Amino acid sequence: MKYITAVPASAGLAVGTVRYLRHTQSGLGRAVRSPKEEQEAFENAVREAQDQLIRLERRAAAQDRDIFMVQRVLLEDEGLRQEVASYIRVGAGAAASVERAAGIFAGRIRALEDPYMRERACDILDACRRVVKVLDGQPHETLRLTGPAILVAEELYPTDIVTLDRSLVLGFITSAGSP
């Protein structure tokens, strides 16, 4: 038996099976095409990511639907799209451009005073991670729990949490903060 001690987000004790959620790395090493082709790939990936979010929103519980709508709106943000396009124009691949722009935008939002807005940084990273998955041809991971478990991850994103069967989640352990 292994004991894990951490800073609790709420009172209580959880004992159970541990399930690890490891987000796969993006395919930043793939060949970069022309800026025009990379921009087209980015636009197509955004549309596909938005379609995925619409499908998730339709299946989600009423209290969770806003998460998917917010992420769809974030993917339409003109500033984010221009930031991605600027990296593509100078020769970066679409996936690398999305990841870089997402990091910059998330950093700006984390610096805001409004706590609600700071929370949106995670939504930007989550939505952009979905776009990168589409660009890389990887399915977006969803964790399917088969029994009660403690979920361990470096970081949990909003869509990770709302797509889980919460009746099976005994607790969360993250190294990057609370979900």
Predicted regions: what they are:
Residues 1-179:
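Non-catalytic, soluble scaffold/interaction modules
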